[in-house]
Amino acid sequence: MQVLVKVPGSCGELIQGKVSGKDLLVTCPINLYSQVSIKESNHNNFENINKKSFLAITRTLEYLNIKTTNYKIKLVSELLQGKGMASSSADISAVIKAIGLINNVDLSAEKIAEIAIGIEPTDGIFFEGIVAFDHIKGEVLQYLGQALP
């Protein structure tokens, strides 16, 4: 079995600040993606997996209570690093989702947020559409609608 997960980047923060004492971040997904492919293998083979993505692998496996693995995991990103395109958030969330799916667990966006927030503050780009998101606590404050195609 092979799993392929794509998570969009963003065009930067549309809104960032605090509302009623809660941190708030609104980002808009774009048509550029981080893509993770994963399949079972004879040994672990990680391609283009950086430190944060590796943490996403280990923390997701811990959550799923999986002790040993043999996966070939490849991450390919169209997103520029360090340019406000949510590249780390897209990489991390794509890895989390893929690890769940290869183990027959469809992790919710809320669970992905919980795991991702344990690694770094994260954008809510893995939620459907556009959300007002507490990027520190990993909580959706409000669903704002679908992004334009």
Where is each model-derived feature located?
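C-terminal nucleotide
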Residues: 3-4, 101, 146-149
